[in-house]
């Protein structure tokens, strides 16, 4: 009974290491499978060299496109700026004698839109607006509509910018030196003709006086139309404009030095071309040497062939002589 108890007590002790070994083996097998699966997942997640190169190329393209997408700075005047420049000089407070369409320029304050004729000429006579101002501003739509209408001269065909002389004299042209002043129409003309003449003269004078300080151009009279136009100094050869710093900066940024990636690629290409040239020179030199060596060998072989032929001839002659002597 004691021995059986001892065996029964020893059996679990003896079998426990085997079970532990089996359990460890199973655990290691499971761990190895998990590790293999984990490694496969990591390898799948890890980007390949092709993906890395693709990312680098896209980054280079983005860097190249960034300076190209920046638009060059423009110096064009906006319509609001143009409208602010085209506004007439500040008006004086209206009096009982002044009409809504008549502006009396003050002699104390100088107008910011001064003409080359001087402020004294403009201050002597009132400036006539052919249209009623809208909210204190000049009505540009009405001015454009009036300018598009044909100009009618009552005294017949105009000559040298003046209306033909019927009964009431001619309309003074812009060569008189006063642009945009009130025009005295002939007495025989109708009210619609007077209004058209005043609108044309007033519009041309206002636009001319407003555009002169902005564009820096001189007034030129055209006798065919009886209005003032502007001749740009660029047509006479005296125009010279300095580029703005924003434009020069944009052009330097756009077409200046290449980027770092382009510089590196150009340098590598030049190095590759130099290496190719050196290799081609070396190849040609070796080819010439090889051809010379072959020519030398051919000449040596030809000389040896000649010597062997002569030796063969002498041997034949000796052999023939011996045969003759033996017979």
From Swiss-Prot:
Keywords: Coiled coil, DNA-binding, Nucleus, Phosphoprotein, Transcription, Transcription regulation
Residue(s) carrying Phosphoserine: 48
Region (Leucine-zipper): 294-315
Tissues expressing the protein: Expressed widely, including in head neurons AFD, gustatory neurons ASE, the olfactory neurons AWC, and in the ASI sensory neurons, as well as in the intestine and gonads in hermaphrodites.
Changes seen on gene knockout: RNAi-mediated knockdown positively modulates lifespan.
Biased composition (Gly residues): 161-172
Highest taxon of source: Eukaryota
Known outcome of mutating residue 48 to A: Abolishes phosphorylation by activated cmk-1
Coiled coil: 284-318
Record note on modification: Transcriptional activity is enhanced by phosphorylation. Phosphorylated by cmk-1.
Matches recorded under InterPro entries: bZIP, bZIP_sf, CREB1-like_pKID, Leuzip_CREB
A GO-annotated cellular component: nucleus
Major site of localization recorded for this protein: nucleus
SMART domains, A to Z: BRLZ (SM00338)
An example Gene Ontology biological process: serotonin receptor signaling pathway
Domain KID: 16-75
Signal peptide: none
Pfam annotation, one family: bZIP_1
Disordered, as annotated region: 27-114, 151-200
GO molecular function: cis-regulatory region sequence-specific DNA binding; DNA-binding transcription activator activity, RNA polymerase II-specific; DNA-binding transcription factor activity, RNA polymerase II-specific; identical protein binding; RNA polymerase II cis-regulatory region sequence-specific DNA binding; transcription coactivator binding
Function noted in UniProt: Transcription factor. Transcriptional activity probably positively regulated by phosphorylation. Modulates expression of target genes, acting by binding to regulatory cAMP response elements (CRE). Acts downstream of the calcium-triggered CaMKK-CaMK1 signaling cascade, consisting of the protein kinase kinase ckk-1 and the protein kinase cmk-1. Plays a role in learning and memory, feeding behavior, stress response, entry into the dauer stage and modulation of lifespan.
Assembly and binders: Interacts with CREB-regulated transcription coactivator homolog crtc-1.
Name of protein: CREB homolog crh-1
Originating organism: Caenorhabditis elegans
The organism's taxonomic lineage, starting at the top: Eukaryota, Metazoa, Ecdysozoa, Nematoda, Chromadorea
């Amino acid at each position: 009974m004691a021995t059986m108890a001892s065996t029964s007590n020893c059996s679990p002790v003896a079998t426990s290491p085997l079970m532990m070994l089996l359990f460890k083996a199973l655990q290691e097998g499971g761990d190895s499978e998990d590790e293999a699966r984990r490694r496969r997942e990591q390898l799948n997640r890890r980007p390949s060299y092709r993906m890395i190169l693709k990312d680098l190329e896209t980054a280079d393209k983005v860097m190249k496109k960034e300076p190209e997408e920046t638009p060059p700075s423009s110096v064009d005047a906006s319509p609001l700026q143009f409208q602010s420049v085209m506004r007439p000089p500040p008006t004086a407070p209206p009096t009982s004698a002044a009409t809504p369409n008549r502006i009396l320029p003050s002699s104390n304050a100088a107008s910011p839109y001064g003409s080359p004729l001087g402020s004294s000429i403009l201050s002597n006579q009132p400036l006539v607006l052919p249209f009623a101002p809208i909210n204190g501003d000049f009505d540009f739509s009405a001015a454009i509509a009036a300018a598009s209408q044909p100009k009618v001269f009552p005294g017949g065909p105009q000559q040298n910018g003046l209306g033909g002389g019927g009964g009431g004299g001619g309309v003074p042209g812009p060569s008189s030196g006063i642009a945009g002043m009130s025009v005295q129409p002939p007495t025989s003309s109708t009210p619609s003709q007077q209004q058209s003449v005043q609108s044309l003269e007033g519009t041309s004078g206002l636009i001319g006086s407003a555009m002169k300080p902005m564009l820096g151009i001189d007034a030129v009279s055209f006798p065919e139309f009886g209005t003032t136009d502007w001749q740009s100094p660029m047509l006479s050869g005296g125009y010279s404009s300095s580029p703005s710093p924003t434009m020069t900066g944009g052009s330097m940024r756009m077409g200046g030095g290449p980027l770092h990636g382009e510089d590196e690629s150009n340098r590598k290409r030049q190095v590759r071309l130099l290496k190719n040239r050196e290799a081609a020179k070396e190849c040609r030199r070796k080819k010439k040497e090889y051809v010379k060596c072959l020519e030398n060998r051919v000449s040596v072989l030809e000389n040896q062939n000649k010597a062997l032929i002569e030796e063969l001839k002498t041997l034949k002659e000796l052999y023939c002589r011996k045969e003759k002597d033996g017979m």
